[in-house]
């Protein structure tokens, strides 16, 4: 189990803990749990907000903790989103990032720059856990578009992973309160929309789409919590 935990943290963050991808495939339910560590790192600015520009620091810590793998997937998905209908599949497989991908990533960073400042630790933790949980749901509910990293994990995903992975989601929803319903709704909406769009245009889901689910759910959940908190 220790090896599986190290593998999850190493795969989902930039922390060089080693591990084995094959071991992670057997324990995909660890995704939401590893997200709590990312939330702790990203929340550091809230403890030193009187000394630094925490908006910029929070964004830097987020990228430092999670790395750019999922952001890279978001960029590829952004290229496909803006590509002509007959070239969407080609665009998401292209290794070069185009204007569409850059635009989507810039908007994503701007959202985080604003939202991380307005969110407390529990809201960030819930949003991070939901982001990873959305990856599990998308893998369970979808079919792979082609062979790759996405299909590699989707071969092993099971209802057990989704069930065990739901525990931190439930606990954090209880802690955050009624506003968590807005975050849950936004997360499920992202999963359903990505599934429908990807199966229509790509024939299924690949690693880039799964990575996009992480980014889009994180931003959508933070947005939903911010709006719900002001109502």
UniProtKB/Swiss-Prot annotation:
It is a multi-pass membrane protein. Pathway: Cofactor biosynthesis; adenosylcobalamin biosynthesis; adenosylcobalamin from cob(II)yrinate a,c-diamide: step 7/7. Keywords: Cell membrane, Cobalamin biosynthesis, Magnesium, Membrane, Transferase, Transmembrane, Transmembrane helix. It comes from the Archaea. Pfam families: CobS. One of its GO terms (cellular component) is plasma membrane. The keyword Nucleotide-binding does not apply. One of its GO terms (molecular function) is adenosylcobinamide-GDP ribazoletransferase activity. InterPro entries: CobS. It catalyses: alpha-ribazole + adenosylcob(III)inamide-GDP = adenosylcob(III)alamin + GMP + H(+); alpha-ribazole 5'-phosphate + adenosylcob(III)inamide-GDP = adenosylcob(III)alamin 5'-phosphate + GMP + H(+). One of its GO terms (biological process) is cobalamin biosynthetic process. The chain crosses the membrane at residues 28-48, 97-117, 121-141, 162-182, 209-229. Coiled coil: none annotated. It is found in: Cell membrane. Its EC number is 2.7.8.26. Its cofactor is Mg(2+). Belongs to the CobS family. Joins adenosylcobinamide-GDP and alpha-ribazole to generate adenosylcobalamin (Ado-cobalamin). Also synthesizes adenosylcobalamin 5'-phosphate from adenosylcobinamide-GDP and alpha-ribazole 5'-phosphate. This is Adenosylcobinamide-GDP ribazoletransferase. It comes from Archaeoglobus fulgidus (strain ATCC 49558 / DSM 4304 / JCM 9628 / NBRC 100126 / VC-16). The lineage of its organism: Archaea, Methanobacteriati, Methanobacteriota, Archaeoglobi, Archaeoglobales.
């Amino acid at each position: 189990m220790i090896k599986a935990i190290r593998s999850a943290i190493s795969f989902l963050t930039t922390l060089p803990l080693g591990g084995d991808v094959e071991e992670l495939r057997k324990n995909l339910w660890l995704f939401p749990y590893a997200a709590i560590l990312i939330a702790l790192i990203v929340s550091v600015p809230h403890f030193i907000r009187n000394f630094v520009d925490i908006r910029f620091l929070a964004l830097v810590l987020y990228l430092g903790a999670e790395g750019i793998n999922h952001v890279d997937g978001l960029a590829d998905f952004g290229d496909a989103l803006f590509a002509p209908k007959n070239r969407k599949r080609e665009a998401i497989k292209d290794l070069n990032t185009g204007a569409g991908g850059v635009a989507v990533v810039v908007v994503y960073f701007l959202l985080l720059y604003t939202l991380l400042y307005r969110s407390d630790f529990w809201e960030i933790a819930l949003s991070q856990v939901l982001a990873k949980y959305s990856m599990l749901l998308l893998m369970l509910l979808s079919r792979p578009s082609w062979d790759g990293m996405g299909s590699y994990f989707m071969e092993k995903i099971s209802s057990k992973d989704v069930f065990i992975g739901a525990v931190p989601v439930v606990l954090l929803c209880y802690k955050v309160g009624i506003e968590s319903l807005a975050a849950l709704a936004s997360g499920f909406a992202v999963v359903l929309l990505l599934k429908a769009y990807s199966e229509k245009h790509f024939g299924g889901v690949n690693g880039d789409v799964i990575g996009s689910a992480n980014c889009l759910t994180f931003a959508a959940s933070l947005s939903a919590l911010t709006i719900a908190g002001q109502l």
